[in-house]
Swiss-Prot record:
Residues 2-54 form the bHLH domain. Pfam families: HLH (PF00010). It comes from Mus musculus. This is T-cell acute lymphocytic leukemia protein 2 homolog. One of its GO terms (biological process) is midbrain development. Residues 76-108 are annotated as: Disordered. Keywords: DNA-binding, Transcription, Transcription regulation. GO terms for molecular function: DNA binding; DNA-binding transcription factor activity, RNA polymerase II-specific; protein dimerization activity. The keyword Transcription regulation applies. Transmembrane segments: none annotated.
């Protein structure tokens, strides 16, 4: 009987830990409306999409900054052309109202 109580307690603690982790993750995912309650499945799917979106944005910023420096040295004052977001990016922005980070986003 004691072993069953211990096992139940441990499982309850584990489940609370998982639920707390999902609650923290939900707070990091932009949604519309902002207080929308997401299921665990929705949370994981949107987190993956949001991470992919952010990786793409950061990669483009890095390429843009590197490109500007290289073009500035070679071509003078001609800035690189701005690329429009992919259809998936526009859908993510429209569906979930993802704020696009400005130049100072994440700066110390």
């Amino acid at each position: 009987m004691t072993r069953k109580i211990f096992t139940n307690t441990r499982e309850r603690w584990r489940q609370q830990s998982v639920n707390n982790a999902f609650a923290k993750l939900r707070k990091l995912i932009p949604t519309h409306p902002p207080d929308k309650k997401l299921s665990k499945n929705e949370t994981l799917r949107l987190a993956m999409r949001y991470i992919n979106f952010l990786v793409k944005v950061l990669g483009e910023q890095s390429l843009h900054q590197t490109g500007v420096a290289a073009q500035g040295n070679i071509l003078g004052l001609f800035p690189p052309k701005t690329r429009l977001p992919d259809e998936d990016d526009r859908t993510l922005l429209n569906d979930y109202r993802v704020p696009s980070p400005g130049p100072s986003h994440g700066a110390p």
